[in-house]
Amino acid sequence: MAGRENDSPIAAAEPLVDLTAASTGAAAAEVPPELLAQSLGQYLRAWLQRIRSGDSGVLPVLLGIIVVAIAFQIANGKFLSPQNLVNLFEQSTIYMLLAMAEIFALLLGEIDLSVGLVMGLGAVLVAEMIQPGGLGLPWWVAIILTLLLCSFVGLVQGSMVARLKMPSFIVTLGGLLILEGVCIIVLGGSLVGIGNSHYNNEVVIYDLFYGKFSPLVSWILLAVVVVGGAGWVWFRDSQRRRSGLVAPPASLTLLKILVATAAGVIVVAVCNVNRAHFGTIVGLPYLIPIVLVVMVGWTMLLQRTRFGRYVYAIGGNPEAARRAGISLPKIRTWGFVLASLTAGIAGVLFASWQVSITTNVIKDANQYVLLAVAAAVIGGTSLFGGRGKTLHGVLGGLVIGSIYNGLFLLGVPAEWIDVVVALVLLAAGTIDVLSRRGAQPRA
């Protein structure tokens, strides 16, 4: 039976544990030593030891964001202003979502070159569906249908990769070209606008990107998230300790809660500063909870479910995963479906951001394909499969957004900005290769 692919989604727990422990580069390969620590001091020592061994996690990208922010603030005193910081996050949202979409493919050791045009398709579909002179669908129906159709694109591409054994590069490159043509055909050379003053459905879509909570609601949302999140994390870790399972020290759990709370307070405080030169613009953008929900949802899926363990196992060692009874075609197909679904979410926000959708906007979506891969890799996701988190996509998207934003403030031409982003990508790719090489056991 080991020589035959098993389509059953059910596999024994023990073989999967052995599999992931043996898979080189799999994110869930071993229990990190710091998780076995009994105190905060032991945790920090084990964490530093892991960094010295070459497994630095998100530390490089966090340090990179800090360095970039300081450098641009010194070069241009406006970079860290509340107005620019909120603008920076809004500009980075598309990069973040597309990077999270790409991560599903990269974790499986594949690549999806179509996510940018799936985003374009999502933008065209949702804009066309809500037009009063067209289908005139309610905004929520338009969004659901858009996400379903985008997911169908992933289903087709994933099936071709998983069932027909076609290279994902070829399949998704073909998908990119087909989707570009489909978007242009659907638009028919016309402009599709999304206003914010007359038609209710258009206003809702418009507000997804440009809408903001009031300052009071922003603080209430933060309080709900902090109390709910902190309570869940504390309860989860406490339950694991009482059950004799691996869990971080209570002091570390408390420290994480305090750090997350402080970060949330800073974000809401910055957003509640008046950012308008004339009039008033305050409040938390709707975009922040949208990205947060997507990131947390996909993190839970990848880190806390059997499906997520299977994804990491396949990316780390496909043959061992197959022998453990994992259905490779099914998991790979679902990986591409989720990538396209996430790109569809980005497409809805892209339509809101652009306000009007034209063929030129769709052609511009091509550049987001490579930026999605760049954001995922810069954030810390491996190009070789089996290692990465959705958080890496958010951080990588923030890095790319910071570079574009900072260099734009300095008046650097667009072509040179692309050169800088490419150099950062090459550096991240080099680090990925070297870290993998260092992690391989010596003969």
Which role does the model predict for each range below?
Residues 110, 336-347, 351-421:
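Transmembrane alpha-helical segments in multi-pass inner-membrane proteins
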Residues 70-133, 159-169, 184, 320, ...:
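Single transmembrane alpha-helix segments in multi-pass membrane proteins
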Residues 2-64, 68, 191, 228-264, ...:
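Cytosolic-side transmembrane-helix boundaries in multi-pass membrane proteins
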Residues 307-332:
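Short cytoplasmic-facing helical segments at TM-TM junctions of multi-pass membrane proteins
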Residues 179-302, 440-443:
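Transmembrane helix-bundle core of multi-pass membrane transporters
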Residues 134-177, 395-396, 400:
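Alpha-helical transmembrane segments within multi-pass membrane transporters and channels
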Residues 77-87, 184, 188, 271-288, ...:
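Inter-helical junctions in multi-pass inner-membrane proteins, predominant
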Residues 9, 33-98, 133-141, 280-281:
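Membrane-interfacial amphipathic/re-entrant helices at transmembrane-helix boundaries
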